[in-house]
UniProtKB/Swiss-Prot annotation:
It comes from the Bacteria. InterPro entries: GIY-YIG_endonuc, GIY-YIG_endonuc_sf, UPF0213_domain, UPF0213_GIY-YIG_endonuc. Pfam families: GIY-YIG. Disulfide bonds: none annotated. This is UPF0213 protein in potE 3'region. It comes from Serratia liquefaciens. Residues 6-81 form the GIY-YIG domain. Belongs to the UPF0213 family. HAMAP family: UPF0213. SMART domains: GIYc. Gene3D superfamilies: GIY-YIG endonuclease.
Amino acid sequence: MTDTLSPWHLYMLRLPNGMLYTGITTDVERRLAQHQAGKGAKALRGKGELVLAFHCLAGDRSKALRLEYRVKQLSKTQKERLVNHPPLTLDHLLPDAEIKTG
């Protein structure tokens, strides 16, 4: 299911109530479909339509996990800024790793 050779992605989903959910995966489309089918994170079940708000390459699994942690520590305002004005890289979140957005 999670090929260690596949690149990992960080993604953010917008819930109908405006909340942003952050996760990592090797296949964004597959993971979004799982969430929408109610087979993903329990926190998203029954929350309504989920919209992919942001995604970026995150490198290997280790970097993706660290990036996910850092993004989850951001305030709602900082997350909205990331979604609405994606930077070219997320290097400022993980100074030791180059993370490309887009």
